[in-house]
UniProtKB/Swiss-Prot annotation:
Disulfide bonds: none annotated. Its main location: mitochondrion. GO terms for cellular component: cell surface; cytoplasm; mitochondrial inner membrane; mitochondrial prohibitin complex; mitochondrion; nucleus; plasma membrane. Keywords: Acetylation, Cell membrane, Cytoplasm, DNA synthesis, Membrane, Mitochondrion, Mitochondrion inner membrane, Nucleus, Phosphoprotein. InterPro entries: Prohibitin (IPR000163). Protein with pleiotropic attributes mediated in a cell-compartment- and tissue-specific manner, which include the plasma membrane-associated cell signaling functions, mitochondrial chaperone, and transcriptional co-regulator of transcription factors in the nucleus. Plays a role in adipose tissue and glucose homeostasis in a sex-specific manner. Contributes to pulmonary vascular remodeling by accelerating proliferation of pulmonary arterial smooth muscle cells. In the mitochondria, together with PHB2, forms large ring complexes (prohibitin complexes) in the inner mitochondrial membrane (IMM) and functions as a chaperone protein that stabilizes mitochondrial respiratory enzymes and maintains mitochondrial integrity in the IMM, which is required for mitochondrial morphogenesis, neuronal survival, and normal lifespan. The prohibitin complex, with DNAJC19, regulates cardiolipin remodeling and the protein turnover of OMA1 in a cardiolipin-binding manner. Regulates mitochondrial respiration activity playing a role in cellular aging. Belongs to the prohibitin family. This is Prohibitin 1. The modification Phosphotyrosine is found at Y83. It is found in: Mitochondrion inner membrane; Nucleus; Cytoplasm; Cell membrane. The lineage of its organism: Eukaryota, Metazoa, Chordata, Craniata, Vertebrata.
Length: 87
């Protein structure tokens, strides 16, 4: 079920006038014909997979950091108890 996809691009910078011919020749007028819906779906899936993987890695890193902080608190408490008992 391939559908037509309309994409609008907004450029948020002013190109250097001397580079406009090069930009035009590298992009050309047929930029809208370079991708079909199948390619857009495939590329989107890859992007979504990368985003999901990065999210999972961030959650795991946060959990590891929390576990290390808890270990540090326990170690500090144990050292404090040992110090109190050594008096």
């Amino acid at each position: 079920d391939l559908q037509n996809v309309n994409i609008t691009l907004r450029i948020l910078f002013r190109p250097v006038a001397s580079q406009l011919p090069r930009i035009y020749t590298s992009i050309g007028e047929d930029y809208d014909e370079r991708f079909d819906a199948g390619e857009l779906i495939t590329q989107r899936q890859v992007s979504d997979d990368l985003t999901e993987r990065e999210f999972t890695e961030a959650v795991e890193a946060k959990q590891v950091a929390q576990q290390e902080a808890e270990r540090a608190r326990k170690l500090e408490a144990a050292e404090d108890i040992a110090y109190q008992l050594s008096r």
